[in-house]
Structures are given as structure tokens and as C-alpha cells.
């Protein structure tokens, strides 16, 4: 044990102190600048410095886990327990009850019809994880910046989406994503992960006997509403802003967003490009969801009335159902599918693009917005998409792909790469611009 502690101390001296000195220096400099009024106290630290600080902290934690591997195993086990605790209090709507202000555990247990003792133990554990705040003097729990992200929308209106608690008015909230991940149907799919690995089909299909998309279309339309709404909350990563700033949409008059959900990216494109119209191609149920949810936003409703954005029912596997356009977009669509289906989808789009070229004499472009895994499995950037890749495997039967894997399905579909642009901010997607061969 003494040897382990000595190694830990040595690693702290080697790895921790330089990082700690750097972080402290930045904070002292920031404080002095505030004192001298060179910058406002409300200004945040520059993003680069913030990212570096987080990397320093992460690297120190990672180094300790390498020295004492038991720490890693305990952390992984604890993470699962924390998720279960958080899932329960989320289901009990504890966050919603705390929106009006701090409450004692007795008040919370009465509101949630729960065991006061057991609820307190769970809340205490989540407080230690900095998900809630606890005031020792008056023994009340309250929301913090983390738990506020998991509150529901304002009181229900006539909209069925608000009545179901899945229409969030705050782009920063993550309630819909958490609802989806903690939904019993999803949990059952994770319990079938062993069957997924053994059989090669998704855990969802192993458990429910059909694919995820078949299930939400045929058996459980409520989870489809959650799924569609959860896609909105990718706004929390500001990915749509990255895309708008990272690609010139203004040179395209007609854009078709294939599998564009309820129009999140489409509305952003229209808002920033006055001469561009967008067609969102989706399945019938999603089109209904998109039109319904757009009704609560006056700006979106006006855009639809002006026909600058239209929803169209179609099937991306069938070329004739894909409308003509100058630019086709597929944002995080291909990763939902295995290679055979991905090639079928891309071939279908390529066929439509070829018909458009024969008709107009101009070749449309296809913009794929998706993750690209690093070919080197030991590269730190590989970690960014490994967990999403497991989600694809277990739930929808799709996968995240390396550049060489992307190259294979693109070539097999009769397409070729023009440009690739990688974003260096979460969720670390890439823009792959394609044309027909």
C-alpha cells in the first residue's frame, strides 16, 4: 500500500503540480484583470483556456486510474448507480417540484408519494454528485445549474406535446434526451446487449423482435415524439450554429434535408439565408409532429406559411419520393443504418442527383453531417464517438464509421468526396461534401 501511495504522490508531483500551477496562474490573472477593470467580472474565460483546464483535470484523473485500476472500476460502477438514481427522481418529477423554490424532504416525499427515508438517501447521493444543492441550516433541497436542465416545460396548454411534457421551450434543456435514454423500452434494449453482441442484431431488435424505427412507427408513437423532440436538444451543443457558420448555404436555392426530423436544421438554414428554401423529407408521423410543434413558434409558422420551409412525406430508400434540389443534406442519418442499408440510402440519393443533373445539366451536391472515427483506436479523439457508436449498435443497429469505412460506402453508392471539414467542438461532427461519380 505504501508503494501505491508513493507512486500516487510521485504522479501528482509530475502531472498534477504543473497543471495546477497553470490553472492557478490563469485564475489569478483573470482575477487581477477584473480588479483592474480590464475585463468584466461577467465575462467568461476564453474557450481555449476552459478546454485546457478541463483536459488537465481529466488527464490527472485518468493518470490516477492507470496507477490504481480499482478506481476506474469503482467509478464505472458508481456511474451506473448515479444514472439509476437520477432516472428515478426525474421520473418522479422532483426537478419540477423544486422549480418553485427549495423544499424539505418531507415536502418532496408528499408531493411524489414516496418513502421519505429512501427518497432522502437518493437525494443525498445526487447532492454529492452536484446535481442538487442542499441547505443544511433549513434542511432543504434546491435546483442547481445541472438539475435545471432536466425540468419540464411550462404548465400544459392545448398542445398534446406540452401535455405529454415533451415540448421544451428552452434549447438548453436536456429533459427530452434524458426521457429517451431512461425510457423503459430503451432500458430493455440495453439489457439485451449480450444478445446483440452474440447475434449481430441490435439489442433493441433482440428484445422487441423489430427494429427501433419499426417499433416507434408501429407500436409506440409516444416514444417517437420523444425521439423527435430529443433531436431538438442537440441545440445544447450549438451544433447547428457550427454548421451554419461552417458551410455556405446561400449559393443553393433549393435544399432538401433528408431525414431532417421536425426541421431543426432546416429552420436555421432559412433564418440565415434569405434566398434559400428548404424541403424536409420525413416519414408521415414525423411530418405531423413537425407541423404540430411548429405551431407554437410564430416565426416558424410564418416561414411555413411563406413556404420557405415545407415538410414532405417520403421514403429515402425510394428515389422517386425524393424531391429535386440543388443541395441534399443528411445530418446524423447514415449512422443509424448498417452498411447494406446505408449503401441503399446513398444510392437512392445518388440516383435522384443523377436524374437532376440529366434534367438541368448541373450536378447537385450531397452534404453528410456525421461523425468520423479516427482510424487509430489509441488516439484520444477516438473516445469522442465510441459511446455514440455503442448506442447505435445497441438501439438502432447502425454504427459510427472511420474515414476508410465512409470511403467504402460512398464509393459503393456511386458518389465521390469533394471536401471534408471536421469540427473541433462537441459533438465533433464532420461535413462531408459529395457529388455523383
Curated annotation (Swiss-Prot):
Keywords: Methyltransferase, S-adenosyl-L-methionine, Transferase. The active site is at residue 335. Pfam families: Dimerisation, Methyltransf_2. It catalyses: (3,5-dichloro-2,4,6-trihydroxyphenyl)hexan-1-one + S-adenosyl-L-methionine = 1-(3,5-dichloro-2,6-dihydroxy-4-methoxyphenyl)hexan-1-one + S-adenosyl-L-homocysteine + H(+). It is an enzyme of class 2 (transferase). S-adenosyl-L-methionine binds at residues 259, 282, 315-316. PROSITE patterns: SAM_OMT_II. One of its GO terms (molecular function) is O-methyltransferase activity. InterPro entries: COMT-like, O_MeTrfase_dom, Plant_O-MeTrfase_dimerisation, SAM-dependent_MTases_sf, WH-like_DNA-bd_sf, WH_DNA-bd_sf. It comes from the Eukaryota. Its EC number is 2.1.1.-. GO terms for biological process: biosynthetic process; methylation. Belongs to the class I-like SAM-binding methyltransferase superfamily. Cation-independent O-methyltransferase family. COMT subfamily. This is O-methyltransferase 10.
Amino acid at each position: 500500500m505504501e508503494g501505491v501511495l508513493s507512486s500516487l504522490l510521485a504522479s501528482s508531483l509530475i502531472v498534477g503540480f504543473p497543471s495546477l500551477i497553470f490553472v492557478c496562474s490563469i485564475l489569478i490573472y483573470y482575477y487581477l484583470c477584473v480588479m483592474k477593470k480590464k475585463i468584466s467580472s461577467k465575462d467568461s474565460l476564453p474557450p481555449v483556456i476552459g478546454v485546457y483546464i478541463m483536459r488537465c483535470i481529466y488527464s490527472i484523473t485518468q493518470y490516477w486510474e492507470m496507477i490504481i485500476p480499482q478506481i476506474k472500476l469503482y467509478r464505472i460502477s458508481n456511474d451506473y448507480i448515479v444514472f439509476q438514481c437520477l432516472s428515478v427522481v426525474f421520473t418522479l418529477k422532483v426537478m419540477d417540484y423544486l422549480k418553485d423554490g427549495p423544499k424539505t424532504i418531507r415536502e418532496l416525499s408528499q408531493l411524489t408519494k414516496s418513502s421519505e427515508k429512501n427518497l432522502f438517501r437518493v437525494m443525498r447521493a445526487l447532492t454529492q454528485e452536484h446535481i442538487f444543492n442542499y441547505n443544511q441550516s433549513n434542511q432543504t433541497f434546491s435546483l442547481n445549474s445541472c438539475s435545471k436542465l432536466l425540468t419540464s416545460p411550462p404548465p400544459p396548454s392545448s398542445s398534446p406535446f406540452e401535455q405529454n411534457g415533451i415540448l421544451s421551450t428552452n434549447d438548453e434543456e436536456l429533459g427530452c434526451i434524458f426521457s429517451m435514454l431512461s425510457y423503459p423500452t430503451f432500458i430493455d434494449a440495453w439489457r439485451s446487449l449480450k444478445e446483440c453482441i452474440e447475434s449481430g442484431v441490435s439489442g433493441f431488435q433482440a428484445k422487441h423482435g423489430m427494429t427501433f424505427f419499426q417499433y416507434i412507427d408501429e407500436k409506440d408513437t409516444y416514444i417517437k415524439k420523444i425521439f423527435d423532440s430529443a433531436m431538438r436538444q442537440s441545440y445544447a451543443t450549438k451544433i447547428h450554429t457550427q454548421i451554419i457558420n461552417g458551410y455556405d448555404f446561400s449559393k443553393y436555392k433549393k435544399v432538401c434535408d433528408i431525414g431532417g426530423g421536425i426541421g431543426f436544421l432546416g429552420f436555421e438554414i432559412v433564418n440565415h439565408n434569405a434566398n434559400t428554401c428548404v424541403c424536409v423529407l420525413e416519414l408521415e408521423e414525423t411530418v405531423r409532429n413537425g407541423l404540430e410543434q411548429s405551431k407554437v413558434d410564430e416565426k416558424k409558422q410564418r416561414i411555413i406559411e411563406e413556404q420557405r420551409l415545407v415538410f414532405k412525406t417520403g421514403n429515402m430508400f425510394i428515389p422517386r419520393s425524393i424531391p429535386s434540389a440543388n443541395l441534399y443534406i443528411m445530418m446524423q442519418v447514415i449512422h443509424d443504418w448498417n452498411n447494406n442499408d446505408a449503401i441503399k440510402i446513398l444510392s437512392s440519393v445518388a440516383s435522384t442527383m443523377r436524374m437532376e443533373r440529366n434534367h438541368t445539366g448541373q450536378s447537385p451536391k450531397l452534404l453528410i453531417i456525421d461523425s468520423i472515427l479516427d482510424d487509430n483506436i489509441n488516439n484520444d479523439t477516438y473516445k469522442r464517438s465510441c459511446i455514440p457508436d455503442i448506442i447505435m449498435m445497441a438501439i438502432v443497429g447502425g454504427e459510427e464509421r472511420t474515414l476508410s469505412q465512409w470511403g467504402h460506402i460512398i464509393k459503393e453508392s456511386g458518389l465521390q468526396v469533394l471536401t471534408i471539414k471536421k469540427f473541433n467542438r462537441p459533438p465533433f461532427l464532420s461535413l462531408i461534401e459529395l457529388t455523383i461519380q
